[in-house]
Amino acid sequence: MYRFLSLRRMTTVLFVAVALSPIIATGAHAANTDLRRDVEVKLVETQRKAAPDLKVGKATCPAALSKPVAKLGSGIHRCAVVVEGVSVPYDVTLRMGGLVKGGSYTVQNAKAVIDTKKLVGIASTVVDNPKTAKISCGASRVVLVAPGATLKCTVVEGEATETLTFVVKDLRGMVSLST
């Protein structure tokens, strides 16, 4: 099946994270501060720490998060942060209590965020001649996928072309090479 791939080395890539580290951040929020701004700042800061080599842009949250905390109540809101030009969705879970008339929140990515440059790096570990093979896992640097989805990389070496299929295992971006 894999004409120029080393089957011996394929087992080394079976559960490797290629995602930007998923954001699982927490924050506390007092009743008289702007929750929307707090969350947007936290999203950008945490994303920059998780992926310092990627361009992280502006974060946006719904206007509803600008309401007084007491009127928001507990619940989940969808925010987004731009990474390499791609709008990456995040779920913000609000929990009331914990602070005087305030609350707390957690932020987690809603989809696996795959860095295709890292995926190319993993694919290069299973080809026999990584220096001469041309590997492409798509034009976009960042790809959003749900767990269970597949990502394909094309490997070209001389006249031979092969497709590698990776299965995304979870929101952390763990992938396995489908054989």
Annotate each language-model stretch with its function:
Residues 2-14:
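Bacterial N-terminal signal peptides that target proteins for export
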Residues 59-110:
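Acidic (E/D-rich), amphipathic helical modules within compact regulatory domains
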Residues 24-30:
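Sec/Tat signal peptide C-region and signal peptidase I cleavage site
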Residues 146-179:
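Extracellularly exposed regions in secreted/surface proteins, prominently low-complexity, repeat-rich
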Residues 31-61, 111-138:
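Short, non-transmembrane alpha-helical segments in secretory-pathway proteins
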Residues 13-22:
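Bacterial N-terminal signal peptides
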Residues 56-78, 134-152:
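Serine/threonine-rich, repeat-prone extracellular segments and beta-strand-based repeat modules
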Residues 99-116, 173-179:
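A short, surface-exposed interaction/processing loop segment used at functional sites
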